[in-house]
Amino acid sequence: MSRDFSRTVRVADQIQRELALLIQNEIMDPRVGMVTLTGVEVTRDYAYAKVFYTTLGGDENIQLVEEGLKHAAGFLRSQLAGKIRLRVVPQLQFVYDESVERGMKLSRLIDEAVGKA
């Protein structure tokens, strides 16, 4: 069982590396600007992959980037099929990662609390 888990993690890491390169070098959509992939979760059967990303800008920029990534998902999946060797290349679902933003807010709150003490 642990062997299957480690393979899933390795596949997710490989997908993250390859997608980062593809987004940087192949996607020409102006909506997809500075995107950082923060993680990938792959289902056990490798049918689906949640790709977590962050981007610079406000809420309207997040919406534009998400639309651009969803539009490019089919292209990215086909390019990914040529880069990695899997029987089934997972369908990509892009999800904005709010953890970085939440971490910055918590850090700011801690700094304010320490400053008052």
From Swiss-Prot:
Top-level taxon of origin: Bacteria
Cellular component annotations (GO), alphabetically ordered: cytosol
Principal location class: cytoplasm
Swiss-Prot/TrEMBL keywords: Cytoplasm, Ribosome biogenesis
Localization of this protein: Cytoplasm
Complex and partners: Monomer. Binds 30S ribosomal subunits, but not 50S ribosomal subunits or 70S ribosomes.
Alphabetical list of PANTHER family matching this protein: RIBOSOME-BINDING FACTOR A, CHLOROPLASTIC-RELATED
Name of the protein described by the UniProt record: Ribosome-binding factor A
The species this protein was found in: Nitrosomonas europaea (strain ATCC 19718 / CIP 103999 / KCTC 2705 / NBRC 14298)
Gene from which the chain derives: rbfA
